[in-house]
Amino acid sequence: MPSFDIVSEITLHEVRNAVENANRVLSTRYDFRGVEAVIELNEKNETIKITTESDFQLEQLIEILIGACIKRGIEHSSLDIPAESEHHGKLYSKEIKLKQGIETEMAKKITKLVKDSKIKVQTQIQGEQVRVTGKSRDDLQAVIQLVKGAELGQPFQFNNFRD
């Protein structure tokens, strides 16, 4: 029986490149001359820390980072940007988490979405991925289009196709 896995993964190498590109753009921006502004990637914790002197500049840095991520093929929905910024002395900062893997709640939403569509496939939650098995390839392609079309707030990739 044909099957595939639904996963949510980000290549940390591409994130590193996006952060470096954002820092390069930051160094050439006129409105950030003489301002203490930093974008740092912590690969162990899978977070990006943005620090600057004002809340407005913090929002500008986030826009620069999102633009760099999109250019590197990383969807901005894979960044978990907090609404509130932290204030330490004269610096404002935000710690952006990278969404890796599918959490149990999201996996249940995907499973419910597929079951409600009445497509004749079975879904299994396997850790941080969802396996979809069906009798025909057309059913699996219908599930892929269904999941891509649903706005679930997280980018998904489809891999491990088996016939």
Curated annotation (Swiss-Prot):
InterPro entries for this protein: DUF520 (IPR007551), UPF0234-like_C (IPR035571), UPF0234_N (IPR035570), YajQ-like_sf (IPR036183)
Keyword terms, alphabetized: Nucleotide-binding
SUPFAM superfamilies: YajQ-like
Cellular component terms per the entry's GO annotation: cytosol
Name of a matching Pfam family: DUF520
Stored CDD domains: YajQ_like
GO molecular function, one term: nucleotide binding
Family per record: Belongs to the YajQ family.
Protein role: Nucleotide-binding protein.
HAMAP family: YajQ (MF_00632)
NCBIfam families linked to this entry: PRK05412.1
Protein's recorded name: Nucleotide-binding protein CGSHiGG_08790
Taxonomic lineage from the root: Bacteria, Pseudomonadati, Pseudomonadota, Gammaproteobacteria, Pasteurellales
